[in-house]
C-alpha cells in the first residue's frame, strides 16, 4: 500500500450541511475501496490564484490516505464527475 495526499476544492456556493455531506461522501469513496484515512485537514475558504468555473474562492480539503491505486483512481473518477468539486489533485508521497 502506498501513501497519497488528496487535495480538493469544494465550490464556495455550497452551504455548511452540503459541504459536510460532500466531505463525508468522498471519504466514504476512499474507505469503501480499501483506503485507510490517516489524516484530514480543513483549510477553510480561501481565495483561488485564478478563476475556476467563474469562482474566485473555494473550500480546501486535504486528506492523507494509505491505499492501493484502485481507491485513489475511483476517487479521481468521481471527483471529475462531481459538480461540487471544482478542482482536485492526488499526489503520491515519497517514502
From Swiss-Prot:
Q: Does the keyword Ribosomal protein apply?
A: yes
Alphabetically, which GO biological process terms does the record hold?
A: translation
Query: A single GO molecular function, which one?
Result: structural constituent of ribosome
Q: Which InterPro entries match?
A: Ribosomal_bS6, Ribosomal_bS6_CS, Ribosomal_bS6_sf, Ribosomal_S6_plastid/chlpt, Transl_elong_EF1B/ribsomal_bS6
May I ask which residue range the UniProt record assigns to the signal sequence?
none
One Gene Ontology CC term in the entry: ribosome
Q: Which domain of life is it from?
A: Bacteria
Key words of the record: Ribonucleoprotein, Ribosomal protein, RNA-binding, rRNA-binding
Gene3D superfamilies named among the record's database cross-references: 3.30.70.60
Membrane-traversing stretches = none
Q: Describe its function.
A: Binds together with bS18 to 16S ribosomal RNA.
Q: Which family does it belong to?
A: Belongs to the bacterial ribosomal protein bS6 family.
- HAMAP family listed in its UniProt record: Ribosomal_bS6 (MF_00360)
Identify this protein by name.
Answer: Small ribosomal subunit protein bS6
- In its UniProt entry, the species of origin is given as Bacillus pumilus (strain SAFR-032)
Amino acid at each position: 500500500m502506498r501513501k497519497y495526499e488528496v487535495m480538493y476544492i469544494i465550490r464556495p456556493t455550497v452551504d455548511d450541511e452540503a459541504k459536510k455531506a460532500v466531505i463525508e461522501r468522498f471519504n466514504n469513496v476512499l474507505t469503501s475501496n480499501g483506503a485507510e484515512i490517516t489524516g484530514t485537514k480543513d483549510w477553510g475558504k480561501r481565495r483561488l490564484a485564478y478563476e475556476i468555473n467563474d469562482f474566485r474562492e473555494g473550500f480546501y480539503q486535504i486528506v492523507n490516505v494509505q491505499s492501493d491505486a484502485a481507491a485513489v483512481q475511483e476517487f479521481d473518477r468521481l471527483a471529475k464527475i462531481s459538480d461540487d468539486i471544482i478542482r482536485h489533485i492526488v499526489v503520491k508521497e515519497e517514502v
